[in-house]
Amino acid sequence: MPSPTIGTSSADEAPGLEQGTMRRVTNRLMPFIMLCYFVAYLDRVNVGFASLQMNKALGFNAAAYGFGAGLFFLGYCTCEVPSNLMLYRFGARRWIARIMFTWGLCAAAMAFITGETSFYTVRTLLGMAEAGFQPGVLFFITLWFPEAYRGRVLAMFLASIPISGVIGAPISGLLLSLDGTLGLQGWQWLYLVEGAPAILLAPIVAIHLQDSPSQAGWLEDRQRDWLVTRMANEKRQIEGRRTYSILQALTNPAVLFLAAIYFTNVCLNNGIMFFLPQIIKGFGNSNTQTGLIAAIPAGVALIAVIWLGRRSDRRQERYGHAAVANLVGGGALLASALLQDPVARVAALALAYAGTISFSGVFWAIPGTFLSGVGAAGGIAAISAIGIIGGFTAPWFVGALKDMTGDFRWGLGAIGCLAIVAAAALYAFGRRRHAEVMTLVTEGTQR
């Protein structure tokens, strides 16, 4: 069920101009955006490594830890749509810089929590501060990259997640070894050191990014003119099918369905990430060994997200690729709950993590095929805000079942089953959407 190609232009007559323009845009924007998301994701999930010392030091059981870890997403979802609308109003450059500065402060403040109340409070504030960053960047990408390029570009952006695991997991393990240095515990050093980069990057964002291609002085005139024209043509074609206001986008059945699917993927992702260090350490590993082993699933995911994004672009198909990724993630997580051998369990968790991360790179190319302008800003934020509730639900659910049963298997197995059902639903939905689009194309041709 290939997605229809949108917005052909004069690039058909001058492929060198298109290739040169998109290469320059990609090289200018994506490495820096990836760096910012690397820092964001590290600050979001480093609580998993901090828990190896923090839980004992502050007296948290698995349910209290899972609840507090998940509160990040409750704060995130309450502020996500307003934050993305502010980005649309004030521009990505200024708003993303504001987001990074405030989340950096909150991430560093995690070093000074003293119990459950302060843990819950600061995690919620961290979520509120970071709200809007991911959907804001996703919206920013729709302003700079034609639809045909978004699968691979989004894969690059979301590759920051496994990169943060490959690099961040060993670093986090080593930071825990600073326990006692200057009177601070290892988990406190982890929060302080990993929170600082966001604060330092904030002013650079304000300088490095531009809000739209028309402001890109680093492009040649003909490149800038081509990109502005291409993006305007695509926007007109999308709006020619139907223009969505912010309210219509927020209540659109397709948006709500995609939000529900994203919810299952967020459950899958965070069910793995917040407890993976504890699972690995439970096999008898040290903190440093845990960090090194935890980098393995991230490395597998890095390969998967880039490969699937490129394949999706070549086929110009999104729904089926995303469905298969969620199916692989859910099936592998279920397998990890059934396996006994530690090596086999880590391998299954690596495959599950690869599925959940590669899903996102393809999935986020879907909303831009039927939303644009303020409708895209609101719709993307709504999908993210509703779906991100899974980030609150999954850690609490897995932690509570761990306290009840003494094992992580029950919670992880249940989340795996949920992801499998969602994969089937997404595939069926994609086939129906493709049929509807092809009907519109046929009717337009007949006219």
Segments the model singles out, each with a brief description of its role:
Residues 59, 91, 112-118, 129, ...:
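Helix-breaking motifs and short loop linkers at transmembrane-helix boundaries and internal kinks
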Residues 79-92, 304-316, 402:
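Helix-to-loop junctions at the C-terminal end of transmembrane segments
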Residues 47-48, 247-305, 360, 364, ...:
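Extracytoplasmic gate region of multi-pass secondary transporters
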Residues 94-108, 320-335:
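Structural signature of the two symmetry-related core transmembrane helices
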Residues 152-176, 197-198, 384-394:
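Glycine-rich segments within core transmembrane alpha-helices of 12-TM secondary carriers
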Residues 78-117:
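Conserved MFS/SLC helix-loop-helix module at the cytosolic interface between two early adjacent transmembrane helices
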Residues 370-407:
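A late C-terminal transmembrane helix in Major Facilitator Superfamily
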Residues 122-159:
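Cytoplasmic helix-loop-helix junction between adjacent transmembrane helices
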